[in-house]
């Protein structure tokens, strides 16, 4: 058995980020195909066929063709172990994506050549920048007509505030797409017959493309002069991104991307948990960044997704749950290949394992071999939309409660129980989350319900240094207070003016829009 440092050095744990429809799920499929994890890369566009994308495993995702939960997939490639976290492609699921990005060491950004930098990409890059996450860029859909590649790179640099270092460069696009030129290897890789031609000055190119090759040579000369060259240190600091061009749906340009990625992407990095936790430490540490209910609808299971930060996990280990102060025996854990699960024999730093959860584990929980650590930077955000749950059949109240509690544990929606009355209020970042909640409550828990408007503008978690001040605030504002799903007290403001006035009246109370788990 190899030591922890050796195993950690093999790992590459990363997420793919993009705006919806940039080709993220298709690229995911191709990466898994290259890693030997799947036999057939099923195009997502064939949704009516059985070849649904491997990473979109939930029924609703297969129907709508968007990723709404984060899947975890492990696969080997060139003596490395890659852990790929697929993030939701829909904007309403930004919290799930944010937490996923806390569990990775680098990210792969996908951009559509026709659309350039889009809104969702900007939001995700803001999150990556907060953690100086190294970014690799794949500019997709070169088989279709799009914008000038130079213009798109300028946009990436100005809007996303990261320097670009092209590694491959497109030769034409759309119907005139001939292939890519690899700037480091001085190779032309042809699109149609996949031939590799060594050297941009090779006479073979003049034979094949007499009317185009001179223009390519001129353009690549300009690109070499005007763009940054790849600098590993700047990349690891999150300041520079290597850029690759290709067509994911045609399986072109991906091998070049993957070959370089496993060489340059960082192995598991140190983590802040009150002290610096290094990946090569012998003792096990890890944190929960996601909870998913009903990955197997037949067994009503809940899985806590845990990122291993140091040491080694082995089945049967006793782990210390820092929040509760209790030891928990973990008889077995799960590794993931999208929905296909297998029991983990062992897990090393950088790996993601699934622990069966019966309601005792929450997002942000740290597990160690006895040390009290708190991994920082796993937040909750105040929801932006609120709805009251209306149950069709009052006899299903118990099932509704169980369903809401389990689904809200996952973190895409948040549950609030007002101190007065018997309402259930659900908060979310976007309207799609309510659709997903209603769909899953019906499919997985047999509960039919609707969500109707409620007079809540926003929620703020409340706390105070002085316990008596908090009790006074609670006594005077009971009708606007609620417990959230973790047992934290929240103020549900009916209007913006009300929130501002309440904050003025109660200067001793902290009103928090985000809070660390």
From Swiss-Prot:
GO MF annotation terms: GTP binding; GTPase activity; guanosine tetraphosphate binding; translation release factor activity, codon nonspecific; translation release factor activity, codon specific
Residues reported to bind GTP: 18-25, 86-90, 140-143
Pfam families listed in its UniProt record: EF-G_D2 (PF22042), GTP_EFTU (PF00009), RF3_C (PF16658)
GO biological process: regulation of translational termination
Physiological role: Increases the formation of ribosomal termination complexes and stimulates activities of RF-1 and RF-2. It binds guanine nucleotides and has strong preference for UGA stop codons. It may interact directly with the ribosome. The stimulation of RF-1 and RF-2 is significantly reduced by GTP and GDP, but not by GMP.
Cellular component annotations (GO), alphabetically ordered: cytosol
Domain tr-type G: 9-269
The protein's name: Peptide chain release factor 3
Keyword Ligase among record annotations: no
Cellular localisation: Cytoplasm
Chief location category: cytoplasm
Record keywords: Cytoplasm, GTP-binding, Nucleotide-binding, Protein biosynthesis
Lineage summary: Bacteria, Pseudomonadati, Pseudomonadota, Gammaproteobacteria, Chromatiales
Gene3D superfamilies cross-referenced by the UniProt entry: P-loop containing nucleotide triphosphate hydrolases, Peptide chain release factor 3, domain III
Gene: prfC
NCBIfam families in the record: prfC, PRK00741.1, small_GTP
SUPFAM superfamilies per the UniProt record, alphabetical: EF-G C-terminal domain-like, P-loop containing nucleoside triphosphate hydrolases, Translation proteins
Sequence similarity: Belongs to the TRAFAC class translation factor GTPase superfamily. Classic translation factor GTPase family. PrfC subfamily.
């Amino acid at each position: 058995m190899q030591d922890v440092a050796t195993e950690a050095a093999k790992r590459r744990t990363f997420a793919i980020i993009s705006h919806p429809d940039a080709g993220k799920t298709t690229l995911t499929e191709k990466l898994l195909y290259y890693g030997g994890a799947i036999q057939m890369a099923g195009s997502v566009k064939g949704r009516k066929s059985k070849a649904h994308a491997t990473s979109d495993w939930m029924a609703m995702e297969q129907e709508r063709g968007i990723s709404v939960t984060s899947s975890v997939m492990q696969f080997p490639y060139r003596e490395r172990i890659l852990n790929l976290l697929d993030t939701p492609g829909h904007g309403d699921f930004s919290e799930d994506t944010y937490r996923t990005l806390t569990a990775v060491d680098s990210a792969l950004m996908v951009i559509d050549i026709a659309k350039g930098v889009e809104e969702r990409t900007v939001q995700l890059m803001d999150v990556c920048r907060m953690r100086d996450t190294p970014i690799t860029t794949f500019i997709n859909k070169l088989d279709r007509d799009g914008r000038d590649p130079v213009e798109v790179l300028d946009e990436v640099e100005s809007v996303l505030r990261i320097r670009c270092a092209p590694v491959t460069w497109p030769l034409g696009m759309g119907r005139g797409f001939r292939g890519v030129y690899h700037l480091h290897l001085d190779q032309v890789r042809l699109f149609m017959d996949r031939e590799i031609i060594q050297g941009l000055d090779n006479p073979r190119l003049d034979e094949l493309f007499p009317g185009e090759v001179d223009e390519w040579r001129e353009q690549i000369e300009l690109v070499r002069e005007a763009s940054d060259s790849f600098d590993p240190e700047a990349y690891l600091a999150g300041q520079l991104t290597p850029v690759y061009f290709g067509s994911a749906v045609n399986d072109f340009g991906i091998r070049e991307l993957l070959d370089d990625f496993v060489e340059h992407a960082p192995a598991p990095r140190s983590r802040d948990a009150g002290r610096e936790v290094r990946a090569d430490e012998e003792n096990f540490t890890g944190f929960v960044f996601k909870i998913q209910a009903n990955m197997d609808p037949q067994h009503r299971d809940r899985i806590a997704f845990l990122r291993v930060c140091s040491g080694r996990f082995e089945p049967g280990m006793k782990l210390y749950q820092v929040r509760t102060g209790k030891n928990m025996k973990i008889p077995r854990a799960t590794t993931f290949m999208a929905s296909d699960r297998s029991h983990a024999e062992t897990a090393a730093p950088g790996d993601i394992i699934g622990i069966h959860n019966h309601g005792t584990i929450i997002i942000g929980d740290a597990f160690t071999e006895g040390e009290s650590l708190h991994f920082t930077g796993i937040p909750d955000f105040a929801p932006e939309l609120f709805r009251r749950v209306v149950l069709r059949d009052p006899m299903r109240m118990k099932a509704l409660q169980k369903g809401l509690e389990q689904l809200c544990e996952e973190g895409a929606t948040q549950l609030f129980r007002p101190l007065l009355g018997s309402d259930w209020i659900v908060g979310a970042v976007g309207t799609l989350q309510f659709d997903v909640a209603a769909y899953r409550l019906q499919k997985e828990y047999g509960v039919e319900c609707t969500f109707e408007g409620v007079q809540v503008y926003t929620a703020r978690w409340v706390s105070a240094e002085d316990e008596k001040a908090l009790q006074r605030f609670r006594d005077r504002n009971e009708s606007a207070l609620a417990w959230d799903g973790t047992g934290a007290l929240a103020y549900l403001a009916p209007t913006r003016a009300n929130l501002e006035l309440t904050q003025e009246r109660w200067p001793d109370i902290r009103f928090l829009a985000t809070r660390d788990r």
